[in-house]
């Protein structure tokens, strides 16, 4: 095997990056998870957990748990897959410059303009309907809270990319062990699964028991969920290691055992999600105090969360590698616009929910909640997709979006 450290040094001397062929299965998996993000935000106002609209549908609570228990870790994993090849191809300077334009600039636009405008809808809906946008914006950036919405993922990813560049410069051989494990997992994917699972338990369970699941660290618009910092870091760098070697010879090879054994990952996903739902039922129907859970319950939920997060990440990647790696796909038209859709979508989501607040579209609240969520999702996807397509026509915008 060619040493990663041997390829890293000449990469730093490259003056300009060269184009790299896209991986259809991974592109489609990333687009699929972006659609899950849109669904997540479209339905959360109509959950018993969300406490926003009076119309609620319990099934949406299950959707939120289904998504929130894995999809951000999976997004960091998918993002990390391409970091090491990008560093090797572009060198550190080009890589960081590209990351600034691709992540830093959009993040600033989001937190300065888009997210304040999005959260203004919540201010009008739940607090003061007479607040002007100028007044709300000034209070947001001077007094707070300065919510970054889904854009928090962008700044955290930028920070992880900077850390990766430092590791690439100072410890270029650091990811080679992970890369070797990926190669060994071509025929034995359980090796990587168990390694990632055990490491996830180590970094997540103590953190969530100490910080709790709902605590966020924030500094101005920079925010991250405290208990998941190390989990996201782990998923990101685990993927960096996979990307440091050839996809065709490692864990994510289309003809590898991970893709072939997709029923195993699907079964693990279903079983771990069932455990999560069982623990939620125990919390609401068995335990004496819904607001204070015993240590055994918190530990069991943390373990179920981690198993589901790892299993579902493997499951989605395996399914796309096995069944959606060639030919055309329903996700292909969205591929080029997926990132822009992610950045923009929260604006139409919150404003559509605001405009329909209090409306009734059916004889029972559950039907109204389903109709509202469907309207929000369809119009959000259409409007954010159209906005992204329009923005991408601006000269140079494709380097950002």
Give short role names for the model-derived ranges.
Residues 2-401:
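Alpha-helical transmembrane segments and their immediate juxtamembrane cytosolic regions
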């Amino acid at each position: 095997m060619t040493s990663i450290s041997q390829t890293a040094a000449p990469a730093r001397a490259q003056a300009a990056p060269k184009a790299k062929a896209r991986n259809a299965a991974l592109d489609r998996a990333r687009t699929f998870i972006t659609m899950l993000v849109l669904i997540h935000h479209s339905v959360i106002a109509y959950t018993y957990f969300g406490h926003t609209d009076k119309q609620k549908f319990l099934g949406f609570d299950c959707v939120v748990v289904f998504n929130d228990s894995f999809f951000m870790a999976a997004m960091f994993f998918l993002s990390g897959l391409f970091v090491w090849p990008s560093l090797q191809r572009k060198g550190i300077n080009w890589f960081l410059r590209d990351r600034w334009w691709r992540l830093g600039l959009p993040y600033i636009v989001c937190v300065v303009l888009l997210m304040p405008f999005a959260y203004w809808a919540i201010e009008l809906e739940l607090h003061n309907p007479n607040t002007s946008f100028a007044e709300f914006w000034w209070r947001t950036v001077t007094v707070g809270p300065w919510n970054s919405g889904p854009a928090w993922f962008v700044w955290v990813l930028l920070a992880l990319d900077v850390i990766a560049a430092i590791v690439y410069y100072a410890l270029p051989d650091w990811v080679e062990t992970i890369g070797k494990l990926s190669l060994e997992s071509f025929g034995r994917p359980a090796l990587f699964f168990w390694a990632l699972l055990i490491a996830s338990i180590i970094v997540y369970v103590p953190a969530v028991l100490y910080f709790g699941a709902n605590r966020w660290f924030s500094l101005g618009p920079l925010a991250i969920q405290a208990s998941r910092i190390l989990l996201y870091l782990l998923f990101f760098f685990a993927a960096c290691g996979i990307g440091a070697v050839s996809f065709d010879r490692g864990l994510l090879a289309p003809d590898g055992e991970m893709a072939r054994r997709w029923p195993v990952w699907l079964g693990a996903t279903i079983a771990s999600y069932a455990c999560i739902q069982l623990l939620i039922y125990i919390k609401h129907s068995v335990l004496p105090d819904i607001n204070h859970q015993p240590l055994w319950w918190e530990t069991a939920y943390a373990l179920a969360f981690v198993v589901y997060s790892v299993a579902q990440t493997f499951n989605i990647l395996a399914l796309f590698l096995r069944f959606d790696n060639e030919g055309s796909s329903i996700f292909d038209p969205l591929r080029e616009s997926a990132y822009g859709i992610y950045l923009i979508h929260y604006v139409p989501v919150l404003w559509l929910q605001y405009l329909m607040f209090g409306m009734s579209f059916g004889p029972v609240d559950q039907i109204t909640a389903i109709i509202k969520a469907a309207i929000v999702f369809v119009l959000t996807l259409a409007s954010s997709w159209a906005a992204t397509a329009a923005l991408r026509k601006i000269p140079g915008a494709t380097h950002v979006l």
